[in-house]
Design a protein with these regions (language model features):
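Extracellular, repeat-based ectodomains that mediate carbohydrate processing or recognition
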Residues: 1-340
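Residue-level hotspots within well-ordered secondary structure
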Residues: 340-467
Length: 467
């Protein structure tokens, strides 16, 4: 807490290109109003440097941030975006940028055009350092974006993305506050959807059966045209899905996390799910992340369950963040989700045998390349190739068997070519019961992608042989 302020809140965490974490947050009710401050850590979050002021004004709120990981001219730049109330011109969106890893910030700049009710901005960098900010216009219930091609110095005309139907607050039968906090993500990679921009929001279906769901709009032409789909299209229960947050990973895959109630027949308990698109936002696959549903009313703050979801992704992992109340208290939860390569089972029985079906989904940037599904009895130290790609498998007997007998009756479709989205299906089939002496052995499998030298290796997935 900075001297002279009463409390702080709304933290946004961004990682610089060198891995330095920066927290950008609000400081409330000090002299001059509310401030936007940035804090850096040079020891992986153990200690934090003194705060750096990015802005000080009467009523700042809801700050979000992003870093430019593209190969564009502003590589490494950080941008913070927030809304400001009571400006005399409605509620507006402001940004400030840093070109030195959060040590200093530019003078804040208003970027929205209309004197409207602009609120809750989100920010993302796309290909070639294109900077995108989205927000909700709560006066007209519109989703809006704007973008800058020069590192935030100048901005274009506001772009309309879509209308949305305001979700009731609270949702009927619930107690927690709803708010129009949406998300933007941009493809900063060099893949087939480079430059694409995605906006995710929740909206209300006002006719029976009434419920909230998540939509995502995509543009592949710099915002000139947008097409949107329902993200949670596989849900046939008419349950509520709210509070989306989106990120594009290094393989060009779009990942969106959100709260979801489809597993509760009463449409009440909350789970966290992740939806992924490897085709530029045209279709999504959905995965449950949290272990159990939770009752927001049983926690200490039934009204607030956290306005923000969060999600980030590396080349190998997706990391959703959310408020979780399964303990009876509100906690910040995170999971490491391996959705590039996984098995539908974690065990196979010696008594009956069986099949472990593998899903490969490594993203459109690797689409059309060759792949091997390989196995090993251990993951350490693994194999590191000359170009730095690390395969987390050892060169042992199982490794050699999976190579020699690829595409056999036992190792099915374990060598081939990925589809355009970077996907394939493979399996390990025991062909019936196997020796009980093998029970207790862990088998590890990983996918190696070639172009033709090793280009990428997935995290391993484990299948344990049991009696």
């Amino acid at each position: 807490l900075e001297p002279g302020f009463s409390f702080s809140g709304d933290p946004s965490v961004v990682f610089c290109v060198d891995g330095t974490p920066v927290i950008i947050c609000l400081q409330y009710y000090g002299a001059g109003g509310s401030g936007i401050y940035a804090y850096r850590s040079l020891d992986q979050g153990i200690t934090w440097q003194s705060g750096v002021q990015a802005d000080l004004n009467g009523a700042n709120d809801k700050v979000q941030s992003a870093c430019d990981f593209s190969n564009g001219p502003h590589h490494g730049q950080i941008c913070a975006a927030w809304d400001r109330f009571f400006t005399g011109a409605g509620d507006n969106v402001y940004i400030s940028t840093s070109d030195d890893g959060g040590q200093t910030f530019s003078t804040s700049k208003r970027i929205d055009d209309a004197n409207a009710n602009a609120i809750a901005p989100d920010v993302a960098y796309g290909a070639n350092s294109e900077l995108w900010v989205m927000w909700a216009d709560r006066g007209r219930f519109d989703v809006m974006v704007d973008h800058s091609s020069d590192g935030g110095a100048t901005w274009g005309t506001d772009i309309f993305v879509s209308n949305f139907n305001n979700v009731p607050s609270p949702i009927p039968g619930s107690f927690f506050r709803m708010f129009d906090i949406f998300s933007v993500a941009a493809d900063w990679t060099n893949g087939p959807f480079a430059g694409s921009v995605y906006v995710a929001w929740h909206t209300w279906k006002g006719s029976a059966p009434r419920h909230a769901n998540i939509r995502c709009a995509a543009t592949h032409d710099g915002g000139a045209t947008w097409s949107s789909v329902v993200v949670n299209a596989s849900d046939t229960t008419f349950a509520d899905q709210v509070f989306p947050h989106a990120v594009v990973d290094a393989k060009g895959t779009l990942n969106i996390d959100f709260y979801d109630r489809r597993l509760d027949p009463n449409n009440y308990l909350l789970w966290t799910w992740v939806a992924r698109s490897s085709d530029g936002g045209a279709t999504f696959k959905e995965y449950r992340v949290s272990d159990a549903g939770w009752d927001h009313a049983a926690t200490e703050s039934a009204w607030f369950i956290g306005d923000y979801m969060g999600i980030d992704a590396s080349a190998h992992e997706v990391r959703p963040f959310w408020t979780d109340g399964t303990s009876g208290s509100q906690d910040v939860a995170c999971d490491v989700v391996n959705l590039d390569f996984f098995s539908d089972v974690s065990t196979l029985s010696a008594a009956t045998g069986g099949v472990a079906a593998f899903t490969i989904d490594v993203g459109p940037n690797l689409g059309g390349l060759d792949y091997w599904v390989l196995g090993s009895l251990a993951t350490s130290p693994g194999l590191t190739f000359g170009n730095g790609v690390h395969l987390p498998l050892n060169w042992d007997l199982l490794f050699q068997i999976t190579m020699q007998f690829a595409n056999s009756a036992t190792f099915v479709n374990t060598h081939g070519t990925l589809d355009a989205a970077g996907g394939a299906l493979a399996s390990f089939d025991t062909g019936g019961p196997f020796s009980p002496a093998l029970a207790g052995i862990d088998l590890y499998f990983s996918t190696l992608v070639l172009q033709p030298s090793p280009a990428f290796a997935t995290n391993p997935t484990k299948v344990t042989l049991v009696p």
